[in-house]
């Protein structure tokens, strides 16, 4: 069973989404200058923007206009923060080479990223930065990471220990 299939079994059928919009991903990828991981796009094509149990929020393009692309993908503020305090930010931020690309955030202020150092986006690592500047890095795809969170293995030590609950559901924000 693929990790996406496992997430479907864990989260249940999407309530309001469930369709692909390739043009929106193409526009985002043109804005970023890189392709995004295929399982990330597949998950968000299935479930849409929303959150898992209100804890982990995930965004995706809905219109792909300039304002939305900037809101979703720009990390300029983080890039400047890294320049002024490099010890607090051990990773570069996109569009710097090998920079982090944001894909989510949680209710405790942690930010979730792809570490875009491999030529193949399906081989990118996952990085999580906490609001206290603790960092966690792991291998595996987007869906693999979410499954491991459910299995409570190889997940950030600063992640809420009670999340996800066994009856976790995806809550659409669309």
Residue ranges and their predicted role:
Residues 100, 121-123:
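A generic structural signal for beta-strand entry/edge sites
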Residues 123-129:
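Short polybasic amphipathic segments
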């Amino acid at each position: 069973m693929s990790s996406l299939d496992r997430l479907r079994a864990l989260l249940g059928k999407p309530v309001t989404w469930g369709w692909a919009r390739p043009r929106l991903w193409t526009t985002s990828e043109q804005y970023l200058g890189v392709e995004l991981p295929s399982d990330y796009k597949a998950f968000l094509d299935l479930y849409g923007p929303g959150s898992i149990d209100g804890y982990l929020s995930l965004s995706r393009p809905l219109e792909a206009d300039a304002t939305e692309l900037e809101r979703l993908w720009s990390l300029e503020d983080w890039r400047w923060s890294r320049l002024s305090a490099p010890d607090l930010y051990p990773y570069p931020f996109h569009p710097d080479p090998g920079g982090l690309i944001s894909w989510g955030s949680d209710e405790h202020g942690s930010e979730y990223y792809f570490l875009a150092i491999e030529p193949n986006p399906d081989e990118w690592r996952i990085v999580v930065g906490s609001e206290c500047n603790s960092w966690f890095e792991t291998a595996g795809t987007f869906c693999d990471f979410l499954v491991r969170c459910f299995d409570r293995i190889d997940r950030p030590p600063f992640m809420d220990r009670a999340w996800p609950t066994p009856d976790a559901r995806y809550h659409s924000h669309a």
